[in-house]
Each structure stands twice: as structure tokens, then as C-alpha cells.
Amino acid sequence: PSNRATLGGMVNTDACGKGSRIYGRTSDHVLELTCVLSNGEVLESVPLEPEALSEYKKKSGISANIFKIVDQVVSEKTNLIQEVFPKMSRFMTGYNLAKVYGNSENNFNLNYLLSGSEGTLAVVSKAKLRLTPLPKHKSLLVVKYETFDDALSDAEMLLKSDPAAIETIDEKILSLAKEDEIYLKIKDFVADEKGKSGRKKRPTRTINLVEFCGSNKNHLEKQVTALCKTIDATNNKSGKATGYYRTVDPQEISNLWSLRKKGVGLLGNTKGERKPLPFVEDTAVPPENLADYIREFRTLLESYGLEYAMFGHVDVGCLHVRPALDLKNPEEESWIRELSDKVVELVKKYDGVMWGEHGRGFRSEYTAEFFGEELHQDLRRIKEAFDPNNRLNPGKIVTPLSHDDKVV
């Protein structure tokens, strides 16, 4: 959550969140990194043109070898890297080989490799970042739906209006919100729509929060108005939105985003022995695959008789999914492994990644599943170049090529 985020943590997980379709990940804003290597050596990382890269390779210590090995891997395996790394804004983190050269400057840039490496390559001691001015104007549209499937299926249409963010909140979160103080502030905005006769239309069970930002107020209003007209054209038809609420009021916008921020906290109030758990929480697939992917994901969870909550960044294909399990029950505890394995296969089927936002951590054993064995060995070569004795966050992402230690 934003009240606990630190820049160091953001760099090390290559963090992103609401608005990442527009603003990208942390690595997209890193200009320079100063890092301490496992032997105490200081490494300065900046984008390098070919001549400068050649000079870096001539340096003494393990830094020179790092530049040689990384350059060799990304140069020799260009085609394989392009084939393996998914083409989406929530790109693969944890040794991002695709961006070492495939960045906006087209220069060798180690920052993309270090960002998201979760402390396994070096300790970041200093970061120089690019700042982006905050938008002057905001407008928020609360689009209402009867079902979660309707909300997901509508995302592709909503994306055509080029919003800064689209966030989905499912029925579970909205239901729990009714027992929280936040509901008093937002209940009118998520209420069931009524027809001209005053009779209720289809109930509002889930919502999409669609935010527009910009410096030109008139352009912003035209964007929102155009989207409202599109929604009106199919208003209340089966499978479509039941209605919407439009606001530019800063306090209303803040209250509605507070509902989204409270999602995890609200889930903590779930009654019973089963509690929502975050072990498959940040999978990501291309947005055009999201509705079909989530449909299968839900079928999988329901086959175990599990309840769950889903919310998050529908615009970039990353939904936070928390199945509710009773960890005091040994059988249900074993389902964490079963479900994780099955979700990995499902994510791969839809050309996605298992870790779209929160880093790899204890899911590192799935690295080879997504990178393939050949690139997995190259990642281990890179780890060996940076940390030959496996001192830095050992067991996470990969282990050095010369070590038999296991990942977690």
C-alpha cells in the first residue's frame, strides 16, 4: 500500500500500480543506480553507448565481468528473449533481459536488470529518478455491472477511450464494504440504477473505476463524454453496464479510490476459518485475454469449493486474486501447492506471467517454467557474475551457476 511504499522497495521489485498503462513500471523512470556488490565493490549503472560499454568492460574487479556477461547473454540470445518475454506493459520482472537493449534509448542499460532483481544481484544505495508532473485535472467514471464477467468483458471497450486507469472491484469487496465506514461515503455512487419510472434496473454487484487525467480540461471532458455516450448506447442490455456515475469532485474521487485501497483490509474481515490468501495474487495476462483467463481461473477455484475475491488493474490484465483457505486444515494447506501449479499452467496458456506486480520471492521455483531452461541457465550465469558466493538474498529468483543450492 502507498502508506508503506519506499523507493528502495519499488526499485527492487520494479513496482507499479494504478496508472501503470500510462506511467509504466519503476524501471521506466530510473536514470542511474549506485549499487554495492557482494564483495563490497561499488557499481555505477547508467545507460551506455557502445564506446562507453567497451570502456566499462575494461574496468577491474567483478564489475567488468558483469558488463561482459550481461552484454554477451542479451546479444547472443536476442531472438530467444523476444520469443520468451511477453509483449505487455506488465513485462517480466526479475532480470529483465528484454529491456537491457530494448529500451527507449536503445543503449545498454543495466538499470532494467537491477530493477526488479529483489536484492539478489546488488544492494542499491542510491537512485536517480525521472520525475513526472502530476496531472492538473482528473475525472472519474464509476461504471456499474450486474456481474463480474460483464465488467471484465467491457474492459476492452473502456480501453478504447484511453483512460489513465481502469480498476475493477468485485461483488465480494463491495459486499464487505457495506460493513465499513467507507460505504457511507460512496454508497450513492454505487447504488442500483433506476429507470424513468423509478423502478430499479439490474442490480449493481461489481464496478469498474475508470479514471481520466490530463492538463487540458476540455480535452478530458470530451474523452469522458464520448465514453458515456458509448455506454448509453447499450445501457442496461444483457452483459453490458447497468449505468454509471460521473464526477470531477476531488473528495468524491478520493473516497472512491479509498474503497479500492481498502480492498485487502476489507478481506481481512472475512468471517469463518477460511481467510483470503495472496499466493496467486498478481498474475497478469494481455488485457484482451483477461476475461477468458479469469473465467477459467474462477472455474478452477470453484472446483475446490473455494470462495475468493478479485480486484485490480483490468486495464493491464493484472487482477489481485485471493482464494480463501483454512491453513489449520492440512488438506487445504496442501491446496496452495496444487493451485499454484495449476495457475502457472493457466497463466502460460494465456501468454501471461505469474508475477505481474509483487516480485517473485517464494515463487522463484517457477522461474524456469516461464523463461525456459536455456534462458534460465543464462539467468544463473548473470547471478554468478554479480554474486558468485550466493550471499545476496539467496534462494530468490535463481542461484549462481556453480552452486547446487535450491531456489525457494
Segments predicted by a language model, with ranges:
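Short low-complexity, flexible loop/linker segments enriched in glycine and/or proline
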Residues: 10-13, 181-183, 324-327, 369-372, ...
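Intein/HINT protein-splicing elements and their conserved insertion hotspots or analogous self-processing inserts
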Residues: 50-95, 182-196, 206-209, 213-234, ...
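FAD-binding subdomain of flavoenzyme oxidoreductases
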Residues: 1-155, 160-162, 389-399, 403-408
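Ferredoxin-type iron-sulfur electron-transfer modules and their immediate structural context
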Residues: 274, 349, 353, 361-408
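C-terminal substrate-recognition/cap domain of FAD-linked oxidoreductases
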Residues: 101-105, 111-338, 344-346, 350-353, ...
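Active-site cores enriched in adjacent His and Asp/Glu residues with nearby glycine-rich loops
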Residues: 1-5, 286, 354-355
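Short, conserved loop/turn and helix-capping segments at secondary-structure boundaries
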Residues: 23-24, 145, 333-337, 372-376
